[in-house]
A protein has these predicted regions:
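ATP-dependent adenylation/nucleotidyltransferase module used to activate substrates
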Residues: 1-85, 126, 141, 157-171, ...
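Generic alpha-helical secondary structure
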Residues: 26, 110-117, 155-159
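Mid-to-C-terminal catalytic subdomains of enzymes
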Residues: 70-76, 80-124, 128-132
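C-terminal boundary motif of the adenylate-forming
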Residues: 128-137, 177-181
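C-terminal, charge/polar-rich interaction regions
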Residues: 132-134, 151-158
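Short, aliphatic-rich beta-strand segments
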Residues: 136-147
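Short Lys/Arg-rich amphipathic alpha-helical segments
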Residues: 149-150, 165
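Short, low-order "capping/linker" segments at domain edges
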Residues: 184-192
Length: 192
């Protein structure tokens, strides 16, 4: 079991939070690989991941983790095509980045807050919103779904149920992000 939440370099949620998380993860995986002679830790990083803000890649590199998909220049669309051809049932599963990415940088992360966001997203997924993010900003829940589905959340019955569910989870207000679901949105605050 990893303990990244016990590390302030992770739980304080700085812009390089992923570095602390991956460092912790790889510190647990390295001994397992060492115990299995000739084994090496590999990850699923693909070519598309290399263009985004990914401080965890540095921790993986430092730990000697291999990234065969990226090394072979395989991108996300290729991973999906190969997965479909191989009959994997999850070939078209939407990306689900770490729940810590739902919090603005600098806003502390805890087990309870991660659980709250996880339950909020599960509520929406159960209602057919496979691609969803619930961004936690203080006590507010900001809902992101693909732009073409925004209107569905404004239908009175679903809207009222959504607000009730978010309030029951401990949020004090609920808003809908009119820009829709945009990957990496929180990284806009990072200079460069």
């Amino acid at each position: 079991e990893t303990r990244e939440l016990e590390d302030p370099a992770y739980s304080s949620n700085p812009t390089d939070r992923c570095y602390a998380c991956k460092r912790e993860l790889h510190s647990h995986l390295a001994p397992i690989a060492e115990a299995a002679e000739g084994a090496r830790v590999l990850d699923g990083v693909n070519l598309d991941d290399l263009g985004d803000h990914r401080p965890g890649l540095q921790a993986a590199s430092e730990a000697g983790v291999g990234s065969p998909l990226a090394d072979l220049k395989i991108d996300k669309s290729c991973v999906r095509r190969l997965s479909k051809a191989l009959g994997f049932p999850w070939w078209d599963k939407p990306a689900q980045p770490c729940l810590a990415s739902r919090f603005p940088y600098g806003e502390a992360i805890s087990h309870d807050r991660l659980r709250q966001v996880g339950h909020a997203e599960a509520w929406l997924i159960e209602r057919g919103f496979a691609r969803v993010r619930v961004r936690s900003q203080g006590l507010s829940a900001r809902i992101e779904v693909p732009q073409e589905r925004l209107a569905e959340l404004l239908a009175p019955e679903l809207r009222d149920a959504l607000v009730r569910a978010m309030l029951e989870l401990g949020f004090t207000s609920v808003s809908l992000d009119l820009e829709g679901l945009v990957s990496g949105k929180l990284n806009r605050v990072i200079p460069g």
